[in-house]
Amino acid sequence: MGKTSKRFQELLKKVEQDKIYNLSEAIDTVKTLASAKFNETVEIALKLNVDPRHADQMVRGSVVLPAGTGKVVRVAVIAKDAKADEAKAAGADIVGADDLVEDIQKGIMNFDVLIATPNLMGLVGKVGRILGPKGLMPNPKTGTVTMDVAQAVNNAKSGQVNFRVDKQGNIHAGLGKVNFTKEQLNENISTFIKAINKHKPATAKGRYVKNASLSLTMSPSVTLDTQEVMDLK
């Protein structure tokens, strides 16, 4: 633990604690904070001025990052007949129906994203209690309940990121890897923020974004200019 703390203390010296960074400066800074033995993820944290206890203030959706996430995503699809064929042709890793649900019931879930056609959501409901806590339950708002399974598979493979505000009004997301170019990270982060702004509830009052920061998996965070964040449309 001491070694980790010393490493973290060294990284803290590279961050001006009281400074508000614009997005360009923030990306430059976090790229200098890479210190782990793996390719760290660039993460964003947003504190929104919403109350998710009210249905009309829930912020939830998905967005495809232009430069991808840098991760290999395994996609499973619950579909039958022609839709199953479409999913396979689109590159889905696992395609099934009753057999796939049985595997899930046994705890066999070798996938990162689950897509289902609307007519089979009754079947998916049998394993809702297993999928829900893992964040794998298909949902129309994230484009994972759809008849266009080919597009959904393509989105997932291309770098789709799902977001959902938590009970405290926070949203966290990984938006690429530290070895991405500055341009790739800027494009990904800007695209994500625009999606968050697009989903601003009509009933939200005051400043929509209260706090925003950027960090790596194992680094301190840098504070983003919330006005610049809110101005990204």
Curated annotation (Swiss-Prot):
Signal peptide: none annotated. The keyword Chaperone does not apply. GO terms for biological process: regulation of translation; translation. One of its GO terms (cellular component) is cytosolic large ribosomal subunit. InterPro entries: Ribosom_uL1_bac-type, Ribosomal_uL1, Ribosomal_uL1-like, Ribosomal_uL1/biogenesis, Ribosomal_uL1_3-a/b-sand, Ribosomal_uL1_CS. One of its GO terms (molecular function) is tRNA binding. PROSITE patterns: RIBOSOMAL_L1 (PS01199). Keywords: Repressor, Ribonucleoprotein, Ribosomal protein, RNA-binding, rRNA-binding, Translation regulation, tRNA-binding. Disulfide bonds: none annotated. NCBIfam families: rplA_bact. Binds directly to 23S rRNA. The L1 stalk is quite mobile in the ribosome, and is involved in E site tRNA release. Protein L1 is also a translational repressor protein, it controls the translation of the L11 operon by binding to its mRNA. PANTHER family: 54S RIBOSOMAL PROTEIN L1, MITOCHONDRIAL (PTHR36427), LARGE RIBOSOMAL SUBUNIT PROTEIN UL1M (PTHR36427:SF3). Part of the 50S ribosomal subunit. Belongs to the universal ribosomal protein uL1 family. This is Large ribosomal subunit protein uL1.
